[in-house]
Structure formats: C-alpha cells, structure tokens
Amino acid sequence: MGEISITKLLVVAALIILVFGTKKLRTLGGDLGSAIKGFKKAMNEDDDSAKKTTAEEEAPAQKLSHKE
C-alpha cells in the first residue's frame, strides 16, 4: 500500500498535465531551468572571487619607501 509503482506515477503525471496544461508546465520548467542556471552562475562567480581574494592575500606585500 505504501509503495509507489510506475502506474501510480503515470496517473499522477497525467493528472498534473490535465490540471496545469502543457503550456503552463513548459513555462514552469523553463523558469526552473533558468533559476538553476542563475544559481550555478552565482556559485561560480563566488568561487572565482574567493580564489581572487585568496591570491591577493597570498601575494607578498610591497615595501613602500618614503622620501623626505
């Protein structure tokens, strides 16, 4: 009774398509895909900025000389 079979999944999928329609599901899928793409892009930018900051911190400091 608690198992999820393939027939149950197909019935649920058919009901979802009937309720929302294919156009709404296509739009929802596109929105979800662009959200995931934006999230991955933000994560990569964050990693790049962290690497840049780490490289700047590891670089030796230059001596400043002051002439009077």
UniProtKB/Swiss-Prot annotation:
Residues 43-68 are annotated as: Disordered. Keywords: Cell inner membrane, Cell membrane, Membrane, Protein transport, Translocation, Transmembrane, Transmembrane helix, Transport. The chain crosses the membrane at residues 1-21. GO terms for cellular component: TAT protein transport complex. Its main location: membrane. GO terms for molecular function: protein transmembrane transporter activity. Pfam families: TatA_B_E. HAMAP family: TatA_E, TatE. Part of the twin-arginine translocation (Tat) system that transports large folded proteins containing a characteristic twin-arginine motif in their signal peptide across membranes. TatE shares overlapping functions with TatA. Belongs to the TatA/E family. TatE subfamily. This is Probable Sec-independent protein translocase protein TatE. It comes from Klebsiella pneumoniae subsp. pneumoniae (strain ATCC 700721 / MGH 78578). The gene is tatE.
